[in-house]
């Protein structure tokens, strides 16, 4: 990849991360809190242990994260239907504050996407799907390497 393309890509990733941090702050959340909430909204309820693994947090920080999200009204703890001895964390609806805060960026990105042909759109979202898998695999490798 030419260096200018690499720089454009790095700027894009930085802009996405900075927007995530700004969005979290606007909703009075930490960046990790917003990330955890996004995980729950995308994958559904999970145990605190699973959430800790996905966020890279240990038990204590995961408990405090869940406490903050629960206190803010974004999640609730509920008995695990498969094992009543366990607790799961589940998102509660769609957070209105988050939707309000993210609406301008979503609208702008939607406008940009409407400028692409169906073929370009397909390539773009194929890339997003493949890059998601690549980043998740790379993150897992880093976690495994650091744990060992």
Each model region followed by its residue ranges:
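Charged, amphipathic alpha-helical coiled-coil/dimerization segments
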Residues: 70-122
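Short amphipathic alpha-helical/adjacent loop interface patches that line ligand
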Residues: 9, 16, 33, 106, ...
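N-terminal helix-turn-helix DNA-binding core of bacterial DNA-binding proteins
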Residues: 19-58
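Terminal interaction helix/tail motif
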Residues: 103-148
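Canonical helix-turn-helix DNA-binding module
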Residues: 45-89
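Residues at secondary-structure transition points
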Residues: 3, 27, 31, 35, ...
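N-terminal leader segment of winged-helix/HTH proteins
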Residues: 1-27
């Amino acid at each position: 990849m030419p260096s200018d393309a690499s720089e454009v890509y790095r700027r894009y990733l930085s802009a996405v991360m900075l927007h995530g941090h700004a969005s979290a702050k606007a909703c009075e959340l930490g960046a990790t809190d917003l990330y955890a909430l996004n995980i729950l909204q995308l994958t559904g309820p999970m145990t605190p242990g699973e959430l800790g693994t996905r966020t890279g947090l240990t038990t204590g920080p995961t408990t405090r994260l869940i406490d903050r999200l629960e206190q803010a009204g974004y999640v609730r703890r509920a008995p695990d239907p498969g094992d009543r001895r366990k607790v799961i964390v589940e998102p509660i609806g769609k957070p209105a504050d988050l939707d309000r805060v993210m609406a301008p960026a979503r609208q702008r990105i939607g406008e940009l996407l409407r400028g692409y042909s169906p073929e370009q759109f397909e390539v773009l979202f194929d890339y997003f799907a493949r890059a998601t898998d690549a980043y998740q695999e790379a993150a897992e490798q880093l976690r495994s390497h650091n744990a060992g």
